[in-house]
Amino acid sequence: MEPYTLLLFIFVIQIVKQIISAVGKQSIESISWVLYCRVAPKFGHSKLASMSQKSSQLRTVAGERRAVSAQDQYAKWTKLNRQHDKLVAEIEQLQKEVDLDKVKVNTFTGYLIAILTSIPIWFFRVWYRSVVLFYFPPGILPRALEWSIALPFTVTGGVSLTVWMMAAGAVASSLTFLFMFPFEKAVPKPVLAKKSPQQL
């Protein structure tokens, strides 16, 4: 891989990593689950489709049961009540199964986040640890600085991948902060407490 490609690729990964950090892993998991719930029934996910159907039936039965007097139409009310209890039990069982699916979706989302952010960083850090991304002209920087930006495995005068990762991470963090700052909740202005006569 060419050095300039590494430069761009690492910077993009750092941007994605900062965006994920700003949005929050839990928010991404929630979005993933909502998308899964919308898409899965279209591909024959029986649990979600059955749960939606039974929930609709439960609302219908509950409405009919409320409209029937237990004293005047006891047999009909009892039948509706049994249907109601049966549907509630079935929905609870389906909910447990759906909760297990949610755990699987969240686990998959976590793996996907790791694949997109952490794993590439460690791979490049090991595989391209001695690659010089670019050079500074000799004498333009102090000798100690030239030596430090080449750490840990690059020749003096060159910029190592590790240093570029830190620089790209800092820039990505600053850009994310500047973008997210207008959307942050306003901090209330502090009010000075009035001093009592005894404190004066």
Curated annotation (Swiss-Prot):
Cytoplasmic topology ranges: 27-113, 176-200
Keyword Transmembrane: yes
UniProt topological domain (Lumenal) ranges: 1-6, 135-158
Sections of the chain in a coiled coil: 75-107
Membrane-spanning segments: 7-26, 114-134, 159-175
GO cellular component, one term: GET complex
Molecular function GO terms recorded: protein-membrane adaptor activity
Lipid bilayer topology: Multi-pass membrane protein
GO BP: tail-anchored membrane protein insertion into ER membrane; vesicle-mediated transport
Keyword terms, alphabetized: Coiled coil, Endoplasmic reticulum, ER-Golgi transport, Golgi apparatus, Membrane, Transmembrane, Transmembrane helix, Transport
Major localization listed first in the record, in broad terms: endoplasmic reticulum
Domain of life: Eukaryota
Subcellular localization(s) per the UniProt record: Endoplasmic reticulum membrane; Golgi apparatus membrane
PANTHER family for the chain: GUIDED ENTRY OF TAIL-ANCHORED PROTEINS FACTOR 1, TAIL-ANCHORED PROTEIN INSERTION RECEPTOR WRB
Reported function: Required for the post-translational delivery of tail-anchored (TA) proteins to the endoplasmic reticulum. Together with GET2, acts as a membrane receptor for soluble GET3, which recognizes and selectively binds the transmembrane domain of TA proteins in the cytosol. The GET complex cooperates with the HDEL receptor ERD2 to mediate the ATP-dependent retrieval of resident ER proteins that contain a C-terminal H-D-E-L retention signal from the Golgi to the ER.
Subunit structure: Component of the Golgi to ER traffic (GET) complex, which is composed of GET1, GET2 and GET3. Within the complex, GET1 and GET2 form a heterotetramer which is stabilized by phosphatidylinositol binding and which binds to the GET3 homodimer.
Family that this chain belongs to: Belongs to the WRB/GET1 family.
Stated name of the protein: Golgi to ER traffic protein 1
Species this protein is from: Meyerozyma guilliermondii (strain ATCC 6260 / CBS 566 / DSM 6381 / JCM 1539 / NBRC 10279 / NRRL Y-324)
